[in-house]
Each structure stands twice: as structure tokens, then as C-alpha cells.
């Protein structure tokens, strides 16, 4: 997680919240597992995020699979009970920036 925090640090002011989810956060990953990262930002292009994470991919020797949402889009997906977002929110997370309390719209009830 520290490698990812370091590569995202220059973008931190533009990130509302960022976390690792999936097998890495669950502790069930293998050397071949990718690292799933979800970022909520209102003014970051996917290319900026991808470029930052590519450095971490080289360092870690693992593929990083980023998902990027704007705050309003993330809130709408929570409100609409979007399957992917609901599943991710229910799973363990390793926060790279922010905490559970910083998630837009909070946790679904």
C-alpha cells in the first residue's frame, strides 16, 4: 500500500478518497493477482491516474486495475444500489487516502 500511496501523493489534492479492494484487501491475493484500486475524484482524468499507477506497477511487478468515479457519480451508484459499488463497499478496504467516513454518501444502510 505504501508504494501506491507514494505514487498517488502528487495527485492527493485532487483525490477525495482512494482505496485498494478485492483479493489484496482481503489478504487472499497471490503473486499473479492484480491490485484493484478505486479512486473518487472530481477533477482527475483517467489518464492521469493510469500514468501515476504505471510507476507502481513497475515497482511491484503486478498489474493495477484502477476504477475512477466522480463524487456525484459515486453517490448516484450508491443510491441506485449499483451491484459493483455495493459489492466493493461491503468488502475489506485498504485506504490510500481518506477513511470509510470520507466515502461519498457513506455506506449504504
Predicted regions and their residues:
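Catalytic core of pol beta-like nucleotidyltransferases
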Residues: 1-17, 25-32, 41-109
